[in-house]
Amino acid sequence: MKLLIALLWLLHWLPLPILGRIGTAVGTLMYYAIPKRRKIAFTNLRLCMPELSEAQRKDIVMRHFQGYSRSILERSLIWWAPIPRLRRLIHIEPAVPQAEMENGPTILLCPHFVCLDVAGVAARVMPLSTIYSPQKNKAFDDLLRYGRER
């Protein structure tokens, strides 16, 4: 795990478009390299969206693997990039304006795997509370907590 964390740290120096292309390529490889997860995704889509063709399901599953891989590599920016760089890269345009949120409690939902850490950056501009589940791997748990608390 520490080697993977070191690799992520190195990747945070790359420009975002290059990091995105690498993430998409890694996701394509993961689609073929992890048949168990691919099968689970196909099963879920068959059950939830029986009207889709196999080609449509394959496209969705492939894009999921690519998006998930991109999000992991792009987290390196969120965790280690200088704050001025993050401010240039992240544009916060909330679907629910803060003025509307001040009328009472509001629950914001974020896709868990793809943008959870980006939502943490967004939380810096308005008061929010989050939920966190400790990870089994201590090195990974320490990294997630560091990245989300910075």
Q: For the regions a protein language model found, what residue spans apply to each?
A:
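Membrane-proximal helical "anchor" segments flanking the first transmembrane region
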Residues: 1-107, 113-115
